[in-house]
Amino acid sequence: MVLARILSVALVAAATLALGVPQAHGASFLPTPTGPQHVGRVDIRLVDRQRDDRAVMATAWYPTDTEAASRPYISHDPARSVQIAATVADWLHEPLLATTMAAATVPAADGAPVAPLGDLPVVVFSPGMAVPRFLASGLAADLASRGYVVVTVDHTGESPAVEFPDGHIAYGTPPAYTPEYMAEQLTARATDVRLVLDRLPELPVVGTAVDTTRIALAGHSFGGFTAATVGNADPRVDAVAVLDGVLTYDGAPPVEHVERPVLLLGVPAATTHPSWQLVHGDVVEVPGAGHYSFTDVANLLPVSTRLCGTVSGARANAITFDRMADFLDRAIR
């Protein structure tokens, strides 16, 4: 199965040109961060001893004085980048994504020291159901350039493919979407997020720079639901941001009130969903957007109206990045 996906990357390369998707060696595809700081990045492996040594991968994005270079989007090993990209594209039913994800780069200084800006506010980000953490790289890098530490989290077993430092790739199982499955995944995700919160002061490179009294949780889709669920119950969390998500799923306890500053940014179907009627916060509706307009897919596959609607990637980025920064500046800056 994996071999077939890898081979498909070569087969779709010509199609990307025909459809107008940019193809280039080391192409960035992602927008340049808009803040004044360069961006650092470090991958982190966390082990939860309370859950049979469950291993969780995360990436910390942060401001640095080191000039950013063009770095691989997924993996430093090209073959593993191709494998992971092919798997993610297969899960999203968009084979053209395999090419752009595998070729993409991000402007980041890997492992560089944190800029001496004092203690920095923190955002922990949970991706959508069956979506890898790297599809939030554009947003994470932009917030980092504005002075935030952003930790994106992969939920092992649910994420399509997660690479660990030893080169091992943990392939996930496609979601079942049954009530029982959704309840199990919410529990696993919430515990993953709390693990990151517990370990913030110990994280490599950024641990001594984070301000654990200024924390926001954010997420896309089911990741937004995860953020709201944890944020509502954990006193360490000061704010919650939900990108195109709702607050109820079959099988999972609904979030009926959010006792924190909250942002909902999404398509009309999300912003008018009944689960948000009792929640007071900032609501930003983006007509014409698609569910994945709030992720890097908006840049990596702009021709997909199924995933990204009719709003351009540049427009989706501008709205998402600016509204997130405005909300976070008011909530935890």
Protein language model features and the residues they cover:
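Secretory targeting and sorting signals
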Residues: M1-A24
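Domain-level recognition of soluble alpha/beta enzyme cores
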Residues: A24-V123, T310, M324
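Active-site machinery of serine-nucleophile hydrolases
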Residues: P63-D65, I74-L92, F134-P175, P287, ...
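Short substrate-entry loop that stabilizes the transition state in hydrolases
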Residues: A104-L120, F125-E163, A270-T272
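The feature captures the conserved acid-bearing segment of alpha/beta-hydrolase catalytic domains
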Residues: A115-L117, D238-F294
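Alpha/beta-hydrolase active-site loop
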Residues: G157-S159, E163-T212
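Primarily recognizes the serine-hydrolase "nucleophile elbow" in alpha/beta-hydrolase
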Residues: V196-V255
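C-terminal catalytic-base region of ester-bond hydrolases, centering on the histidine
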Residues: W276-R333
